[in-house]
Swiss-Prot record:
Keywords of this entry: Glycosidase, Hydrolase
Active site per database record: E488
Known EC number: 3.2.1.-
Pfam families registered for this protein in UniProt: Glyco_hydro_65C, Glyco_hydro_65m, Glyco_hydro_65N
Region named Disordered: 762-786
Descriptive protein name: Uncharacterized glycosyl hydrolase Rv3401
Binding site for substrate: W361, D362, K590, Q591
Protein species of origin: Mycobacterium tuberculosis (strain ATCC 25618 / H37Rv)
């Protein structure tokens, strides 16, 4: 487990004070750098030792067959797996004739710092070779947020105490060996030497390698160039082969003298462009990087992040761990999305190969809501990517005998890649999640152009899907049968409340959008009768409720299922230790489902219903998904269980910084990183938008004395500053001088020239805090109990 001893809690950086080889893979994920197009895992500069080497290009993948013991109609035949592309991070250092390797000689000191404001990873190492020669190595790495195709590394070697001859080999390496993976289905499939050489060339101080995939027919280019500064004589040579290019720098250093190398990297890929065009694109990016220079790249990186933090920062007084974690999470969300530009945001970002690099409902459901308030330009690009796959989604729906569009449960380029349909294709709610993301973007930004550009078609086709999936019974009630909600331990059910409410929202949203764009809707074949049918279905959707228990049923009949024996089944996650045929017919819940419905469709439940539902479902949720803790934090906060909510917020925030699920090695959990913001801002800040108006109603737990957060709303920058007695709203620059929002159910008009301060609304819980299944209390509570 990652501990505070080696990773101290600091507000604006993640710092590793000593190197633990047993945690290399985890630290490589934490220290990953990305801009949404290029992703570099935080591997050591010298390439070895490593936990999992990784260099990724967004949506650059290979196709592999999906094997079935018993295949059926409609099963996807091929899967998609992210490819580890050409590694440009490597600097091999020889001191005399001995390679710098942290496993040999003496590592006198070692430190790595991820700077969340500078957008850089800095490493400082002091090493004594087996022969007694000492050097200090300092490297700083960045993936440019300002220049999409560019990464760069500054590598400095300093001689200590005596003269040393140093040799630095700066490399581009393709088809690296990757370690064996586990049988865990959440871990990536292995691809053996996935790239075929196309072309290679070299210059005096650089090289370029081009490769393509075999089955997906994607082509990529990776190039490097170097600047070298050193006192005295230096020899520089470059050679290139199909899978390896190397620039070698040899010099002698007296004590205190330094060799400084700046390595510029450029990456690009395409499924359409010619070899010369792709080669020239990479070469042009390299020239542009050298023109900017190392300092220019640093300055542009800082400026980009300064602007982001001005709209996104969250300050948490009283809880330094959550303070560090929420900034860490926001930083990685920005990295995953900033320059993705009409490509997917994978569930692991570009930090690892977990889940094969696929995007799920996590993107629209958890990541985009945060970015809509903090980096809306990235959301628009992510939604454009999803809309670009609409034709594939329509083909998938037709294959399944349905109308409209059926978006894939997991994918890289738009085709369904889930081999397990009960927890894949049957999770139809992803279509409504996508529709809600389009609607939230329109409401929060006030920008209707994206809906007109591509959102309307998505809303219409997803509405058509729901109408063909559902049916009215003889009493006129509308049902959805054979669906799976967010809880994957209760699959293929009737009338999952979350799915039905989200489908109803999708249907109403589509009808409303057609009224805003009548000519475009008519061109897509929408009639008045079709819109009326959408609204009829939405208004008649069945929402199961157990009158005797006074709670909503997660799905029809859920509260009558057998109770799960939590005392006898204590090895988690259950998906790796229990058969689905035992999980499906029992009241055991993988992750927030009905509870998530109360967050996303808050207006559909009364305060009393929320309190009783939280009390019932808390006792049955095991949180075998990283998506659950943030939602439980939000709803526990809303019903008044503030300390329990704080524990869930801690768990959501620290899932990767403390490796709470023991799988950070495979990449970071983007949705849970988003969940840190959600738990704090939506949970304790009381942010809601499901009724089309900005509503903020904060209430803080005892462990947080002050919560101050920034967000964007319809062109305004808003600062919310809450403590235990009052909340202050500061309206910044925007399209006008005033904004009407809602606080504690009452309209409040803010003015740009005057902060508004109002007393917080105190809430008393209707019920005492509920217990959790044995051994599944929030992580922080268990730690405090020891």
């Amino acid at each position: 487990m990652i501990t505070e001893d080696a990773f101290p809690v600091e507000p604006w950086q993640v710092r590793e004070t000593k190197l633990n080889l047993n945690l290399l893979a985890q630290s490589e994920s934490l220290f990953a750098l990305s801009n949404g197009h290029i992703g570099l895992r935080g591997n050591l500069d010298e390439g070895e030792p490593f936990g999992l080497p990784g260099t990724y290009l967004n949506s650059f993948y290979e196709i592999r067959p999906l094997p079935y013991a018993e295949a059926g109609y409609g099963y996807p035949e091929a899967g998609q797996t992210v490819v580890d592309v050409t590694n440009g991070k490597i600097f091999r250092l020889l001191v005399g004739d001995e390679p710098f390797d942290v496993r040999y000689g003496e590592l006198i000191s070692h430190e790595r710092i991820l700077d969340l404001r500078a957008g850089t990873l800095t490493r400082r190492a002091h090493w004594r070779s087996p022969a007694g020669k000492q050097v200090k190595v300092t490297s700083t790495r960045l993936v440019s947020l300002a220049h999409r195709s560019v990464a760069a590394i500054e590598y400095v070697v300093e001689a200590i105490e005596e003269f040393v001859r140093v040799t630095v080999q700066s490399e581009l390496v393709t088809n690296e060996d990757v370690p064996e993976t586990s049988a865990d289905p959440r871990v990536s499939a292995i691809l053996d030497r996935p790239l075929q050489a196309v072309e290679h060339e070299r210059t005096e101080r650089g090289a370029l390698l081009m490769h393509r995939t075999r089955a997906s027919a994607l082509m990529m280019a990776a190039g490097m160039e170097h600047e070298v500064e050193v006192p005295g004589r230096v020899e520089i040579t470059t050679d290139a082969r199909p899978d390896l290019a190397r620039t070698t720098v040899i010099c002698g250093l007296r004590p205190g003298q330094k060799l400084r190398i700046v390595k510029y990297l450029a990456y690009g890929w395409s499924s359409l462009r010619s070899r010369p065009a792709l080669r020239d694109q990479a070469a042009g990016a390299l020239h542009g990087a050298r023109y900017s220079g190392w300092q220019g790249l640093l300055d542009a990186q800082r400026a980009y992040l300064d602007d982001f933090w001005d709209s996104a920062d969250v300050e948490v007084e009283g809880d330094p761990e959550c303070q560090q974690a929420v900034r860490f999470g926001l930083f990685h969300l920005l990295q995953a999305s900033a320059r993705a530009e009409r490509r997917a945001i994978p569930s692991k970002g570009l930090t690892g190969t977990g889940y094969d690099g696929h995007a799920f409902w996590d993107t629209e459901g958890f990541v985009l809501p945060v970015l809509t308030y903090t980096a809306p330009h990235a959301v628009a690009d992510a939604l454009r990517w999803r809309a670009s796959t609409l034709d594939l989604a329509k083909e998938r729906a037709a294959e399944l005998g349905l109308e409209g569009a059926a978006f894939p449960w997991r994918t890289i380029r738009g085709q369904e890649s889930s081999a397990y349909w009960p927890a894949g294709t049957a999770a139809w709610h992803i279509n409504a999640d996508i529709a809600m993301a389009f609607e939230r973007y329109r409401i929060v930004t006030g920008d209707g152009s994206l809906e007109e550009e591509c959102g309307l078609a998505v809303l219409i086709e997803t509405a058509r899907l729901w109408l063909s999936l559902g049916h009215h019974d003889r009493h006129g009630v509308w049902h959805l049968d054979g669906v799976t909600g967010p809880d994957e331990y209760t699959a293929v059910v009737r009338d999952n409340v979350f799915t039905n409410l989200m489908a109803a929202h999708n249907l109403h949203t589509a009808a409303d959008a057609c009224l805003r764009h009548p000519e475009a809707a008519e061109a897509m074949g929408v009639t008045t009768e079709e819109m009326a049918a959408w609204r009829d279905a939405a208004d008649a959707a069945n929402i199961p409720y157990d009158e005797e228990l006074g709670v909503h049923q997660q799905c029809e009949g859920f509260t009558t299922l057998a109770e799960w024996d939590f005392e006898a089944n204590t090895t988690y996650p259950l998906l790796l230790h229990e058969a689905y045929v035992r999980l499906y017919p029992a009241q055991v819940i993988k992750q927030a489902d009905l509870v998530l419905a109360m967050q996303w469709q808050s207006h559909a439940f009364t305060p009393e219903q929320k309190a009783r539902n939280v009390d019932y479902y808390e006792r049955r949720m095991v949180r075998d998904s990283s998506l659950s803790a943030c939602t439980q934090a939000v709803m526990c906060a809303e019903v008044g269980h503030l300390e329990l909510a704080h524990d869930y917020a801690y768990e959501a925030a620290l899932i990767d910084l403390r490796d709470l699920h023991r799988n950070t090695r495979d990449g970071l959990h983007m949705a849970s990183l988003a969940g840190a913001w959600t738990a704090l801002v939506v949970g304790f800040g009381g942010l809601r938008d499901d009724e089309g108006i900005l509503s903020i109603d904060p209430q803080l737990p005892d462990g947080i004395s002050r919560l101050r957060f920034r967000l964007r709303w319809r062109g305004f920058r808003l600062i919310v500053d809450a403590n235990h007695t009052d909340v202050t709203f500061i309206l910044g620059d925007g399209p006008g001088t005033q904004l009407t929002m809602r606080h504690a159910g009452q309209d409040l008009t803010l003015h740009t020239d005057t902060p508004s301060t109002i007393a917080v609304r105190t809430r008393k819980p209707l019920l005492p805090p509920p217990p959790q299944p044995p051994g599944r209390e929030p992580v922080h509570r268990r730690a405090l109990a020891r």
